[in-house]
A protein has these predicted regions:
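Active-site-flanking segments in enzyme catalytic domains
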Residues: 77-240
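A metal-dependent hydrolase signature that marks the N-terminal structural subdomain at the beginning
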Residues: 2-4, 8-115, 215-239
Length: 240
């Protein structure tokens, strides 16, 4: 297990070195297709030891999901020194399998349940919350905090912190959520959860998402395209 956690840190070190060598200015923009085709390079995952009882199967499942996320989003998550941990599900009674906490994508932590593989498979949903957060500047938010074990979870009681709370995506949510069978009933509960669930579908089954919820797919795809352009991945990091 310790070997897996050690290997999980390799991606950050390689990316940071590439940025030191080349800087961000003038780096070519790589297409999403080419980034995903090169995903074996991103073998690591920014795991931090939590209080969960994690086994190799859970870590490997999380790594497999993580490597399906667009590379520009993974890169930014790691460059901001954000982390992923597993929490002890036996100490909780609310059946939560994943949580995301951050401020504009900074000081972020994704917390996953150590119950079977449920937490690992929820990773794309939680990264969806991160992406929704990092592309949007918080507006007049009021935060409260809860502590889960040794982790602090921040949640908003007022204001906006996500792109999916804007009127254009709320309209898409109201139009397509009920017909989108790729998301759960919980993910249909509001526009932010719908964005996270649809981002997971965008990562897992993009062709199906494009069929059942075309406006949702187009919205997320446009955000990813714009993020790729504004956060290019160093070519050395992709081909190393």
């Amino acid at each position: 297990m310790q070997k897996l956690f050690t290997q999980a840190k390799a991606f950050s070190r390689r990316i940071l070195k590439a940025l030191e060598n080349y800087g961000r200015k003038g780096l070519g923009v790589l297409t999403l297709c080419s980034l995903l085709a090169s995903s074996p390079v991103f073998a690591g995952i920014p795991l931090k030891q939590g209080d969960g009882a994690v086994n190799d199967a859970q870590v490997n499942a999380a790594i497999e999901v993580y490597n399906r996320i667009p590379a520009s989003i993974r890169l930014q998550y790691e460059l901001n020194h954000n982390s992923i941990t597993f929490f002890n599900s036996k100490q909780r009674r609310d059946n939560v399998i994943g949580m995301y906490t951050a401020l504009d994508g900074m000081e972020a932590n994704i917390m996953l349940s150590d119950q079977d593989l449920l937490g690992a498979y929820a990773l794309a949903h939680e990264i969806g919350h991160y992406f929704d957060d990092v592309v949007y500047k918080d507006e007049e938010i009021l935060l409260q905090e809860k502590r889960y074990g040794n982790q602090v979870f921040r949640y908003v009681t007022r204001g906006k912190r996500s792109r999916s709370e804007e009127a254009d995506f709320v309209a898409i949510y109201q139009q397509e959520a009920n017909q989108n069978g790729l998301v759960t009933q919980y993910e249909k509960s509001d526009s932010t959860e719908y964005f996270a669930g649809s981002f997971k579908a965008y990562v897992d089954t993009p062709e199906q998402l494009q069929v059942v919820a075309p406006s949702t797919y187009a919205f997320i795809d446009q955000l990813v395209t714009e993020f790729n352009a504004s956060h290019p991945v160093p070519e050395e990091a992709v081909t190393a």
